């Protein structure tokens, strides 16, 4: 999809009403006679501790999914019987106007958001009471600990604080066209920022200079919010999976691993690239990069709706083992190495996860207590449906803290050639990550950041 294509999709309103209907359908799968009101609150303004300034605002994702509204201090009601949606926005506070200007009006909100009616938040209780009386013994569906003390549900026959949250989490797994366009736009901007970082790398002296370059490019494209704290790790720091210091000097380091992505209207991108700081990969870095790129490409090609993610993760380990055997870092029989789980010393994390409004989006069903260390940190388990967006992010790392216990354990050390391994410590780590839209019979790669060796070296050498 070209830039103009996803921009055309994004000219429409965020499809909050369609999402609400999907959520109701899911609620009725477990509660066929469900009737009443869905009530959700957005993020309320909260001051910093010991300060009179507000905390950085991040909208509640459950609320946003049904409204597309990114304003603070709002509420939402959806009448299940009539399919009527009502957005509540804060009334004008004259004392606040002098500082912040006029807030969105009711007419402006009705024009901007996919709702049937807009009211002020001062009308929440009276509106809920009216809706409750329309259907005797109706239920209000809300989320526990996300209802203001001033809101009352006394008129409803029953209260349910669990079902709607679970239904929204299930609904969020399969993305519609608008959501995919949001993720694609976030990817487009982030891919431009990744390229800008590579272009800047030869002139930069520290990680934070490249960090600033990434932020600048995203902000200049109207995407100031990061989906997560960016990782810019030079040299051996790349062996730390979630390195966040971003302040070390670049001199004398082989590569830089950058894991960074912006949001577009609350939808995330999550991209990782590794590139040479000298313009050309060293032999050892190229060895590892080629293995990781093969891991990523082969796993991506296996993606289609309904596939079991565990199988894909297992395939990534098989490719890693083959590559490390060819280099001599591993030795012995590939099947024995896999069964011993020795490859987890070099590829300790999961292959990927769901992506959406959260970087680690809903629906992953991880099992952190899995006795099998190969799957313990896999954030996505089970079959992946068509319509989901996932990350594919294999990596190979040389982390002394992780690898040393394997070298000290005969079960694993017999498969590792320490002399060959010693040549690769300075590589640090290599990870390559793209965002993939799963289709019925295949996939669409939403990430356009360069990753072929010839392209990466050509840009980094400039």
Curated annotation (Swiss-Prot):
InterPro entries: Aminopep_P_N, Creatin/AminoP/Spt16_N, Creatinase/aminopeptidase-like, Pept_M24, X-Pro_dipept-like. It holds the Pfam family AMP_N. It catalyses: Release of any N-terminal amino acid, including proline, that is linked to proline, even from a dipeptide or tripeptide. SUPFAM superfamilies: Creatinase/aminopeptidase, Creatinase/prolidase N-terminal domain. Keywords: Aminopeptidase, Hydrolase, Manganese, Metal-binding, Metalloprotease, Protease. The keyword Metal-binding applies. CDD domains: Prolidase. Mn(2+) 2 binds at residues 259, 270, 433. Mn(2+) 1 binds at residues 270, 393, 433. It comes from the Eukaryota. Binds 2 manganese ions per subunit. GO terms for biological process: proteolysis. Gene3D superfamilies: Creatinase/methionine aminopeptidase superfamily, Creatinase/prolidase N-terminal domain. Disulfide bonds: none annotated. One of its GO terms (molecular function) is metalloaminopeptidase activity. Its cofactor is Mn(2+). Its EC number is 3.4.11.9. Belongs to the peptidase M24B family. Catalyzes the removal of a penultimate prolyl residue from the N-termini of peptides. PANTHER family: XAA-PRO AMINOPEPTIDASE 3 (PTHR43226), XAA-PRO DIPEPTIDASE (PTHR43226:SF1). This is Probable Xaa-Pro aminopeptidase pepP. It comes from Metarhizium robertsii (strain ARSEF 23 / ATCC MYA-3075).
